[in-house]
C-alpha cells in the first residue's frame, strides 16, 4: 500500500510517494500549476497509473500558528473536493501544517 502526498501551493504542487510498505517517503516531483488544477490532476492520474498500489492521498492543510485555517486552506479544501470527486475509490486525508510566514 502506497500513500501519495500532495503539498498544494499557489504556483507549485509538491508530490511525494511512500515505499510499497508505507514506511518511508520521498519526493517525486514539483509541478507548476500555471493557474490550473487540470495539470495537477493529470499528473496525479499518471502517477496513480504508474504506481497501481496507491491507496491513500494525503493533502497538506495550511493553518495559522494559532490553529485557525489560512486563506489558502479554503482554496486547498476546494482542491480536495475535486480529488474526492475524481478519485472516489481512493481514501483522501488531510494533514495539518503550520504557516510560518511572519
Q: Model features per residue range: what roles?
A:
Residues 2-4, 11-102:
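Phosphate- and other anionic-substrate recognition elements at nucleic-acid/protein interfaces
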